[in-house]
Amino acid sequence: LPSPDTEERDRLIGGFIAEHIENESTLQLGIGGIPNAVAGALMQKKGMAIHTEMLTDGMVDLFEAGVITRSPRSTDGGLMRGKMVAAFALGTKKLYGFLDRNPGLALMRGTWVNDPYVIAHNRKQVSINTTLEVDLTGQVCSESIGHRQYSGTGGQSDTAIGAQMSEGGKSF
């Protein structure tokens, strides 16, 4: 699946979000132009980890640039030490080549990866997702525009809740 081109507005939003992400954070990036732009804007960060539902090409780029250098702190008793944690991967041939026999990856059940209480044990967990509508009070809708259904939420609500419960965590 080819990566979509990132539009200028996505890059601006991604840059704004990246300014609010600290070094040594644990990342969850959703699907779409903005999460891809955030990954591109994080290239100067240090000591980052991955605990995400979906592993993407942007995360591989962060790993190859030396940004991803640690594993998330989680409730698994050390089983995931030294690994990037995800439930599935979606991307290009480059991503699938990175997955092949990579001992630094742990693809786990989505029910565990997206469990807010597991996520909350990751220090500075940051959840970044795309939404379709935002109202004046800040409520978001990620499934539809008006009455037309576009997608489901997937693990978005779980990862956002887990990030808010995490010490130093944030959700965008």
Regions flagged by a language model, labelled:
Residues 1-172:
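Conserved phosphate- and dinucleotide-binding cores of soluble alpha/beta proteins
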